[in-house]
Amino acid sequence: MSKRLFLRIVDDLETNYDYFKQKADAKGTLGFTGIQKCTSALRVLAYGNTTDINDEYLKMAEKTTRDTLEHFCRGIIDLYGARYLRTPTWDDLQKIYEVHSAEHGFPGMIGSLDCMHWRWDNCPTAWRGQHTRGDQKGPTVILQAVALQNLWVWSAYFGVVGSCNDINVFEQSPLLEDWISDRAPKASFYANGNYCPHGYYLCDGIYPRYSIVVKTFSDPIDEKRAHFKKVQQSSRKDIERCFGVLKQQWQYLRNPCRAWTKQKMRDVMYACIIMHNMILEGEGKAICHNYVPEVVQEEHPHASMEERVNNARELRYEPYHSALTVDFGTTRMVGSVCPT
């Protein structure tokens, strides 16, 4: 994190939250400054140590460090969540399509979709059964995310119990609900000369054969399909790289979480993802820069039950998924964005 970004966060927190302002106690002794409190929270997140890490460095008690971390994460979400965890607009999708078509050869690709488990050491005993899965070493909570080629996280959904698989998480995620409710932004494109009304996500083999999902061939029968399988698996690693960078930047996510509630875990996870996107923007790696907070986006009307049923039917229409996969697997993967 750059010094400029750190000072920006400190100034915004001091301006909007009384907790981060320096105040005197009953004896007139001044307490910690906003810079000290933000440094405390960032040290815990970056190094992944326990909350007594600042005993000697900042002369800050363990409870103060823990409270500061909670206020810091909540402040980051409230101040920056609307910008750095926003849903892409139509204009954003045009830029995303262009970048992914140039970098990966996939026109219409919105991003890569996958899940990550975070160990929960202090999971209540009564909940351990539903948070434990055989391939994990203990209770976990699942994060589902969508990442771009530059590792920007467009969508994050955290809080599903660890016993679920990727299909269960996907089926209950707001990402799928937005498509069914017709709230998801859509931009059409062409694949192999065929018109496609909306984009898609690259996923691994466990995900269902939905129209917004592109998987690879399990057993390619010719060189073109084998090449497609290689490129698809390589491009899908964007989300794996993103998870690796998140854990490397914020070691707190690599270690088992010691929070007592999932809400505190959720605040930490979303705060780390938001700061991850802020760092990418500060380094000039962001694809979309057209966020205008003054413009109030028009609320989407509620879809009727009939519309929801039709959208769900179109979403689960396997022939569309198969046709799109064949288009990519039988020709050179070059397409153009269709401005509709």
Regions of interest found by a model, annotated:
Residues M1-T340:
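Short, polybasic Lys/Arg-rich linear motifs in disordered N-terminal/cytosolic regions
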